[in-house]
Amino acid sequence: MSHSLRIIFAGTPDFAARHLEALLASDHQIVGVFTQPDRPSGRGNKLTPSPVKALALQHDLPVFQPASLRPEENQRLVASLQADVMVVVAYGLILPQAVLDMPRLGCVNVHGSLLPRWRGAAPIQRALWAGDSETGVTIMQMDAGLDTGDMLLKLSCLITQDDTSATLYDKLSALGPQGLLTTLAQLADGRAQAQQQDDALACYAEKLSKEEARLDWQLPAEQLARCVRAFNPWPVSFFMLEGQPVKVWGANVLHQESDAQPGTIVGADKQGIAVATAQGILLLTQLQPAGKKSMAARDLLNSRKESFLAGTLLD
């Protein structure tokens, strides 16, 4: 039977909230929750609490929202909570060395990749876009570097041909809490075994930009299909047609070659809109014209068939 730990939890988005839920259901004591300041959101730009803050308040947990942990008064606040360990999941703020050293068992992070592959901000999307066959979560002891700390536990899952960032996010949201609770039990009992990362195997998952989501027809169809899956649900792949962006939510690869210029529509029917690429044909199956909802290609063709005639060049 492992011992109960005094835990500070630091996290912000829904992915982090799912880990907080698991801790709330455990025997551990959460002595404080740190999350980013409320941000403007929605059409009215109303200040909105993070998913972690909303969950913490539901459970009457003390919530702290500093803009930085560098000021000494904020570091004194962390120290005053006398935590055994600080659990950090997608918090979004840098932890100074003084904070990393405060808890008796240090600071533990849940990262959405099999480290040292895909250190950085967008590991789920980059793994999909690169065509990786598996990914997972790594529980690590934090140090001052970017996802460079010693690894305490790794759990993996397969990436299927149908996975998007949304579905992979859900898979890792289930794996992460499981791995976290196992690691905390090992830390509490002194059974945790840390393994150093091999820096030679490291690669970095840079933050996504909307510009990257524009489909480049000079790439092979296989790579473009991965791009569509990686950028679903954000920022969503797109192309330009008649001066307007058309988002692509779903696409498949047709293993056929075409002599047409990449970006040229070579066919359109109820199955989808077929576009020539540098190698193979990309079949667009789910699209969203500007100002409209996402729809199946056949529904778009019913209303705008003249825009998707064979020979039309997409930008």
From Swiss-Prot:
One of its GO terms (cellular component) is cytosol. This is Methionyl-tRNA formyltransferase. The gene is fmt. Belongs to the Fmt family. Keywords: Protein biosynthesis, Transferase. Its EC number is 2.1.2.9. (6S)-5,6,7,8-tetrahydrofolate binds at residues 113-116. It comes from Edwardsiella ictaluri (strain 93-146). Pfam families: Formyl_trans_C, Formyl_trans_N. The keyword Protein biosynthesis applies. PANTHER family: METHIONYL-TRNA FORMYLTRANSFERASE, METHIONYL-TRNA FORMYLTRANSFERASE, MITOCHONDRIAL. Attaches a formyl group to the free amino group of methionyl-tRNA(fMet). The formyl group appears to play a dual role in the initiator identity of N-formylmethionyl-tRNA by promoting its recognition by IF2 and preventing the misappropriation of this tRNA by the elongation apparatus. It comes from the Bacteria. NCBIfam families: fmt. The keyword tRNA processing does not apply. It catalyses: L-methionyl-tRNA(fMet) + (6R)-10-formyltetrahydrofolate = N-formyl-L-methionyl-tRNA(fMet) + (6S)-5,6,7,8-tetrahydrofolate + H(+). GO terms for molecular function: methionyl-tRNA formyltransferase activity. InterPro entries: Fmt, Formyl_trans_C, Formyl_trans_C_sf, Formyl_transf_N, Formyl_transf_N_sf, Formyl_transferase-like_C_sf, GART_AS, Met-tRNA-FMT_C.
